[in-house]
Amino acid sequence: MIHNKLLIAGSIILNLVFTIHILYNNTSTWSPTWTNRAALEAEAAASVSCSGHGRSYVDGLGVLDGHKPCECHDCYTGKDCSVLLKDCPVDANSGDPLFLEPFWIRKAEESAVVESGWHRMSYTFNGYGLFMSAELEKIIRKLHNVVGNAVTDNRFIIFGAGATQLLAASVHALSQTNSLSPSRLVTSVPYYNLYKQQADFFNSTNLKFEGDASAWKRSERNDDIKQVIEIVTSPNNPDGKLKRAVLDGPNVKYIHDYAYYWPYFSPITRQADEDLSLFSLSKTTGHAGSRFGWALVKEKTVYEKMKIYISLSSMGVSRDTQLRALQLLKVVIGDGGNEIFRFGYGTLKKRWEILNKIFSMSTRFSLETIKPEYCNYFKKVREFTPSYAWVKCERPEDTDCYEIFKAAKITGRNGEMFGSDERFVRLSLIRSQDDFDQLIAMLKKFVSKEAVVVDSI
């Protein structure tokens, strides 16, 4: 008996010695070993200036040969991106949110992620069959609480490869199956063209895209339809307006696309409290290439159907992507979002001021205007600063606004793609500063042909 007690006491003492040794070494003498090469490689690529008109990346073309080449911004060329091409066509079509890149350059240390070669090799987290990071789910709930743009209490959260995959999962979950009549998908004009493109591409017997929600409401065709799915995009893409549902009734289901409902783009007027809401990292932090989004879902049956869709189509979202999203969102909420949201809002506010000044001198083109509203996040009345300018060609002869701008070497997106009139064109304002500067230069030249002086802008 005494012998056993001595063995137990000896074991406890030995464990204490080992524990103290480990803690002492970890806090006093530990130094990085295997991360050195990765850190040096990342910093070496980031240190290449590319004349301020491009970027060098760890995975850039030529790195396998030991080169760190520059990837130049549009309209710049040369080995170091120092050559500006004359009369280069401007790309105002893409929704790449590169306007936030300067913020993340400032936050290089806080936002950096280094992972081991054996990081999350399993299909699931913790061996419990879960495809989602519990910590990432926690921080998403904190983010919405900080911003005040969505209710997360009593909501399930599901991750997807951007809002694009989540949209498909949502439509699948809400569509009727084994019905003689397919569910109808509607939204308000102008609408994000992906809604129609996805419905047409998947060509499901359970779903049919019907276009404008208001037109559908007035139509006699809706009398015998058992289920309608309305997508409510707020703020709306392309015109930036806050939207509410058009349809009502027991046979209507809703998908609320809140990808742009962040203080950069819109006043936060209320906490969204919906059955199914979609968000994306792309428009939250600017990291479109990470392909990460999430849905807030009230009903468990809908959540389960969406979870099955995500599981069967991709077995969840990349674990590496989830790690990066976690680190980025930790930076965002570190100061309550104050720094990034003020930076993003300030950048877009300045861009809109320049744009409004140019178009105010034109009678040929007009911009969509939205009345300022009180923002619960910034605690003040503020203007809308949407991602895109929704431009109308006012002259009767200018029937195709997209082609009018394209002839002036500005490529936007045709209004017809949004279910609207061809007299409209969408111009992106969220790309890099170089892209915006080139857009403004071309717009000045274009508007100046109306014999109005714009050089002072």
Curated annotation (Swiss-Prot):
Primary role: Probable aminotransferase.
Transmembrane segments: 6-26
GO cellular component: membrane
Membrane topology (UniProt): Single-pass membrane protein
Name this protein carries in UniProt: Tryptophan aminotransferase-related protein 3
Signal peptide (UniProt feature, chain positions): none
Source organism (scientific name): Arabidopsis thaliana (Mouse-ear cress)
Gene3D superfamilies registered for this protein in UniProt: Aspartate Aminotransferase, domain 1 (3.90.1150.10), EGF-like, alliinase (2.10.25.30), Type I PLP-dependent aspartate aminotransferase-like (Major domain) (3.40.640.10)
EC number: 2.6.1.-
Matching CDD domains: AAT_like
Subcellular location: Membrane
Cofactor(s) required, per the database record: pyridoxal 5'-phosphate
Binding of pyridoxal 5'-phosphate, residues: Y123, A163, T164, N237, D257, Y258, A259, Y260, S280, L281, S282, K283, R291
Any GO MF annotation of the entry: carbon-sulfur lyase activity
Pfam family, one: Alliinase_C
N6-(pyridoxal phosphate)lysine: modified positions: K283
Keyword Transmembrane among record annotations: yes
Keywords: Aminotransferase, Membrane, Pyridoxal phosphate, Transferase, Transmembrane, Transmembrane helix
Family as reported in the entry's similarity comment: Belongs to the alliinase family.
SUPFAM superfamilies xref list: PLP-dependent transferases
